[in-house]
């Protein structure tokens, strides 16, 4: 990325080489040298400087942006866009959470042009097929019947005695074979034979790899040969399900470093074929090396090749295990670093598991919509919708603290799901939407969706709706408290809860009693509890009496105490 001239503006310090610093804005009212005061212009980062791998504003978002006369912005101007900028004083690159919030509409069309080009030019990568490794993997050219000394290797690997199975003993046997002019054996052919026939444990792999490393500096003088040997080492791990012990991992890392040194390469793996790069990337991911894995993913993207979906899933899982659960914008920033150039990969391969990971990266509803565009181009979009929709519903429900906005987003998602599946949606999906509408206090939508499904079949589900509504305080949700909202909740209680009250569990009845906030509802609860007690069930009459005292309802207090005395 070339150097850009920055106009005076507010500048944030953040990550330098992936290390976050405290975000401190410059004082906009600080006195300048000439005695005047100035404010720094708000500058939106260029599209090329942003690192978001799946968000791209659609036509409607771009139109609204250009039509905004005041405060044009994308993603509601939230500071959630990972971008690389140059610091004003040092010109050092810094990774920060920025806003797509230009100062004015002037020049917006040019600013948006990279988005249009990205959409026009976006094309899937060529997937790395499993059979491509066959161009590197080959059988050893050794005729075992002509070389009886190979039996010594068989005995050595069968015993796996640490004193016998070592790089030095393997190397000495290979030296003797290579020195025999009648046999005319090359060391790499012996290594290939051993890897293909005898290496079935981590100790065996470590010893052979250490021996290969020694021979790099005295006998192996071709990079393609080194690539073939590394590919066979990794194939032996996969084929024999050999666990990666610290010793085996260390030996393979040392081999890769030695190949780079031997052939004067900064990182030899990037010079290998895409199939070997993919195998090596899988080794790094399985070993927990996140930065090295990112380098190799970048190499595959630069070569316009796409790794397997299973490897992408493994890598995203490694990011989660290393970075942990994101609780702040800086936590998200670290994660975005490791998938910054993954857009071509996501355009090529999108699975339910990949989508699950990416949903957790979304902090704005427009990111969800962009993700759904990628899902629509997937060959397995039906499986993605089936498996990920419940998680997506929950994520959308909690994107903001504004319950009205969340409900609008839920409705848009409901409409998209309806267009995909057709109406009516399944009971499972409807129940997922109902729960999240309840979390946001929208009992009008709760009642509407309950009317679609068989309302008599799920009396126990109604208590779950009340429990979900109680969660709004845990999420610091700003639930509506208007007269209409309270009326909708009261209607839900009278039409859904009270008629099925006796069918609800004891815990569910406790929730119903908690939300019986009028004398009319409390009286209905009292009658139901008296009936339950009459049948010998466990009643809530003492709690009803206490609730009635709070409501100052003398009639209910009297009836509850009369029933308790009997």
From Swiss-Prot:
GO cellular component: mitochondrion
Transmembrane regions: none
Xref: InterPro entries: Aep1
GO molecular function annotation: translation regulator activity
Highest taxon in the source lineage: Eukaryota
A Pfam family matched in the record: AEP1
First and last residues of the transit peptide: 1-13
Main localization, broad class: mitochondrion
Protein's UniProt keywords contain Phosphoprotein: no
Location relative to the cell: Mitochondrion
UniProt entry keywords in alphabetical sequence: Mitochondrion, Transit peptide, Translation regulation
Family assignment from sequence similarity: Belongs to the AEP1 family.
Protein role: Required for translation of the mitochondrial OLI1 transcript encoding subunit 9 of mitochondrial ATP synthase.
UniProt name for this protein: ATPase expression protein 1, mitochondrial
Species this chain originates from: Lachancea thermotolerans (strain ATCC 56472 / CBS 6340 / NRRL Y-8284)
């Amino acid at each position: 990325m070339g150097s850009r001239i920055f106009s005076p503006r507010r500048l944030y310090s953040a990550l330098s080489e992936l290390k976050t610093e405290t975000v401190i804005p410059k004082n906009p009212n600080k006195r300048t040298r000439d005695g005047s005061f100035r404010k720094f212009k708000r500058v939106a980062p260029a599209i090329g400087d942003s690192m978001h791998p799946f968000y791209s504003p659609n036509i409607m978002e771009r139109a609204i942006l250009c039509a905004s006369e005041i405060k044009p912005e994308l993603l509601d101007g939230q500071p959630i866009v990972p971008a690389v900028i140059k610091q004003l004083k040092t010109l050092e690159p810094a990774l920060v959470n920025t806003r797509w919030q230009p100062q004015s509409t002037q020049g917006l069309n040019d600013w948006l042009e990279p988005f249009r080009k990205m959409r026009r030019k976006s094309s899937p990568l060529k997937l790395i097929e499993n059979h491509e490794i066959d161009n590197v993997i080959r059988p050893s050219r050794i005729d075992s019947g002509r070389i009886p000394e190979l039996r010594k290797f068989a005995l050595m690997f069968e015993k796996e005695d640490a004193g016998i199975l070592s790089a030095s003993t393997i190397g000495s046997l290979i030296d003797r074979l290579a020195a025999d002019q009648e046999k005319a054996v090359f060391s790499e052919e012996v290594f290939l034979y051993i890897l293909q026939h005898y290496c079935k444990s981590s100790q065996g792999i470590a010893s052979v790899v250490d021996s290969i490393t020694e021979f790099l500096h005295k006998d192996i003088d071709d990079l393609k040969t080194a690539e073939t040997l590394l590919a066979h080492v990794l194939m032996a791990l996969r084929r024999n399900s050999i666990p990666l012990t610290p010793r085996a991992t260390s030996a393979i890392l040392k081999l890769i470093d030695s190949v780079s040194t031997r052939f004067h390469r900064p990182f030899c793996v990037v010079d290998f074929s895409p199939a070997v790069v993919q195998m090596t990337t899988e080794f790094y991911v399985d070993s927990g090396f996140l930065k090295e894995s990112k380098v190799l993913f970048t190499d595959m993207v630069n070569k316009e090749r796409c790794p397997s979906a299973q490897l992408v899933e493994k890598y995203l899982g490694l990011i989660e295990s290393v970075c942990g659960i994101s609780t702040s914008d800086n936590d998200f920033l670290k994660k975005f670093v490791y998938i910054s150039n993954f857009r071509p990969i996501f355009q090529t391969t999108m699975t339910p598991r990949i989508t699950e990971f990416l949903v957790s990266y979304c902090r704005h509803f427009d990111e969800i919509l962009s993700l759904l565009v990628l899902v629509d181009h997937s060959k397995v979009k039906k499986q993605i919708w089936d498996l990920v929709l419940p998680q997506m519903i929950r994520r959308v429900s909690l994107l903001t603290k504004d319950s009205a906005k969340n409900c609008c987003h839920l409705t848009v998602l409901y409409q998209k799901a309806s267009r995909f599946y057709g109406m009516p949606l399944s009971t499972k999906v409807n129940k997922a939407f109902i729960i999240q509408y309840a979390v946001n206090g929208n009992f009008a939508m709760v009642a509407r969706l309950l009317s679609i499904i068989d309302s008599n079949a799920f009396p126990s589900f109604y208590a779950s709706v009340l429990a979900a509504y109680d969660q709004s305080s845990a999420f610091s949700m700003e639930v509506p408290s208007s007269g209409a909202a309270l009326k909708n909740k009261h209607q839900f209680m009278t039409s859904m809860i009270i008629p099925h009250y006796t069918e609800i569990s004891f815990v569910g009845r406790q929730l119903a009693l908690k939300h019986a906030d009028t004398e009319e509802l409390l009286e209905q609860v009292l009658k139901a509890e008296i009936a339950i007690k009459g049948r010998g069930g466990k009643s809530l009459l003492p709690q009803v009496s206490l609730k009635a005292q709070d409501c100052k309802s003398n009639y209910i207090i009297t009836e509850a105490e009369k029933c308790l005395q009997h």
